[in-house]
Amino acid sequence: MSHAPGEGRPVSSLFPARCNEEVASQNATTMATLNEIELSEIEELSLNFKETPRQDHSMTPVELCYFDDFATTLVVDAVLNFSTHKMCKKRRYLYGDEQRVARELMERFRKDQDWTPAIYGFLNMRSVRSFIEKLAFNKQLEFRDHIIRFLNVFHHDSGYTIQECTRYSLEGNQGAKLVATRAWYRGDKIQRLSGVVCLLSTQDEDTILQPEGSDFSVMYSNRKRCSTLWLGPGAYINHDCRPTCEFVSHGSTAHIRVLRDMVAGDEITCFYGSEFFGPKNMDCECLTCEKTKRGKFSTSDEEENDEPSALSEKRIKYGLRSRSRV
């Protein structure tokens, strides 16, 4: 669905009074120190967009890392109330009271499903304006679109949402999971759930993939013979040895296809690989392994491991996701 500018109305008329007060306060604070982005550009970014952004993009791996960190901070963390996976763990993304502002914007969006106030409110935050003023307009569009991808996680029509997950000890028993909010059937494509992919050169891997365990997801493509950075909402999909869904990559994005019928409350999972969690996934803590007494739940030293059919792309993870309270 596309949204066109609103017949010459000032964008401020589209927002609740409290949102206007927050934006006005932030603008007053930053005017002396920032080269202000023209209001017309903010209006363009906030009013003329698609609820499901185009699949292709021109983000570099570094840009995708920063865009993803910012978007998850603004949207996901504001709802879950803890910091989810970040590529740049030491970077601070929000200033002062902006965490509260983000929480209020997300509370309002989840209630009224109005895109423009949420987008406009985020883009007018001091920290966001400081970040995007350095970007060319086409990159501002891509940053805005990445925020929209995460807003879809909380849209009533998405058919899924995100919840806290306490299953995995390697995450300190505080992570996230995606769950269905409606029935899905084998072969369905989850339209509002996607991953964003960037090819990684050897130099990119040396620059981005930190040995101390930066949080990121990587897929190795046998077809392309290179590693690809995988972020976006799809990065929150957990592994299961009997998955409900699968990754389907195409170009610079990947969509999610349903493998088994699901009802509301079922977790959206994919298969990462037969040795992702050690030999024969001996350290796997997925629900299927718990039910079948395999992986981390096995009581024997040796076990047979019935593997799902081989994937053309093997998902490899170089670091563990850490979580800290906001």
UniProtKB/Swiss-Prot annotation:
SET domain span: 163-273
Gene3D superfamilies: Histone-lysine N-methyltransferase, SET domain
GO molecular function: histone H4K20me methyltransferase activity
Ranges that cross the membrane: none
GO cellular component: chromosome; nucleus
Stored SMART domains: SET
EC top class, as a word: transferase
Catalytic activity, as annotated: N(6)-methyl-L-lysyl(20)-[histone H4] + S-adenosyl-L-methionine = N(6),N(6)-dimethyl-L-lysyl(20)-[histone H4] + S-adenosyl-L-homocysteine + H(+); N(6),N(6)-dimethyl-L-lysyl(20)-[histone H4] + S-adenosyl-L-methionine = N(6),N(6),N(6)-trimethyl-L-lysyl(20)-[histone H4] + S-adenosyl-L-homocysteine + H(+)
GO biological process entries: methylation
Pfam families linked: SET
Protein task: Histone methyltransferase that specifically di- and trimethylates 'Lys-20' of histone H4 (H4K20me2/me3). H4 'Lys-20' trimethylation represents a specific tag for epigenetic transcriptional repression. Contributes to dosage compensation of X chromosome-relative to autosome-linked gene expression, possibly by converting H4K20me1 to H4K20m2/me3 on autosomes. Involved in the regulation of growth and body fat metabolism downstream of the TOR complex 2 pathway.
Identification of the protein by name: Histone-lysine N-methyltransferase Suv4-20
Biological source species: Caenorhabditis briggsae
